[in-house]
């Protein structure tokens, strides 16, 4: 089964049936932020899904290869970084992983985080 995994984006050339991955040449499955490193809201998550759909459509007609999946995953990772920098999502300080892989957050006060772009 072809797949691409980045820190916050897992893409599988597969369908999910009964909690199992079934390899597919025609379906991609997306798992966003599997470690719950971010605090998500529905609008931000829908933006990621829409961007994923747009990227997949841009590759229509091209071979389904690991390289192309990695390109889509990298583009989505950058898209998520943009959401973080714009303040549409925030780091989850209760996450089991406090990696701050997309830049250090700035703490403004008790329980409030401000993301610092490029840090």
Curated annotation (Swiss-Prot):
<keyword id="KW-0997">Cell inner membrane</keyword>
<comment type="function">
    <text>NDH-1 shuttles electrons from an unknown electron donor, via FMN and iron-sulfur (Fe-S) centers, to quinones in the respiratory and/or the photosynthetic chain. The immediate electron acceptor for the enzyme in this species is believed to be plastoquinone. Couples the redox reaction to proton translocation, and thus conserves the redox energy in a proton gradient. Cyanobacterial NDH-1 also plays a role in inorganic carbon-concentration.</text>
</comment>
<comment type="subunit">
    <text>NDH-1 can be composed of about 15 different subunits; different subcomplexes with different compositions have been identified which probably have different functions.</text>
</comment>
<comment type="similarity">
    <text>Belongs to the complex I NdhM subunit family.</text>
</comment>
<dbReference type="Pfam" id="PF10664">
    <property type="entry name" value="NdhM"/>
</dbReference>
<keyword id="KW-0521">NADP</keyword>
<keyword id="KW-0813">Transport</keyword>
<protein>
    <recommendedName>
        <fullName>NAD(P)H-quinone oxidoreductase subunit M</fullName>
        <ecNumber>7.1.1.-</ecNumber>
    </recommendedName>
</protein>
<dbReference type="InterPro" id="IPR018922">
    <property type="entry name" value="NdhM"/>
</dbReference>
<keyword id="KW-0472">Membrane</keyword>
<dbReference type="GO" id="GO:0016655">
    <property type="term" value="F:oxidoreductase activity, acting on NAD(P)H, quinone or similar compound as acceptor"/>
</dbReference>
<keyword id="KW-1003">Cell membrane</keyword>
<dbReference type="GO" id="GO:0005886">
    <property type="term" value="C:plasma membrane"/>
</dbReference>
<keyword id="KW-0874">Quinone</keyword>
<keyword id="KW-0520">NAD</keyword>
<dbReference type="GO" id="GO:0048038">
    <property type="term" value="F:quinone binding"/>
</dbReference>
<keyword id="KW-1278">Translocase</keyword>
<keyword id="KW-0618">Plastoquinone</keyword>
């Amino acid at each position: 089964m072809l797949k691409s995994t980045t820190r916050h984006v897992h893409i599988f050339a597969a369908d999910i049936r009964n909690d199992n991955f079934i390899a597919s040449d025609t379906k991609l499955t997306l798992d966003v932020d599997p470690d719950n490193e971010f605090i998500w809201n529905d609008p931000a998550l829908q933006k990621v899904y829409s961007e994923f759909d747009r990227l997949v459509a841009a590759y229509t007609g091209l071979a389904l290869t690991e390289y192309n999946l990695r390109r889509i995953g990298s583009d989505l990772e950058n898209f998520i970084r943009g959401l973080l920098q714009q303040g549409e999502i925030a780091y989850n300080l209760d996450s089991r992983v406090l990696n701050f892989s997309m830049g250090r957050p700035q703490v403004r006060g008790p329980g409030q985080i401000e993301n610092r772009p490029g840090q």
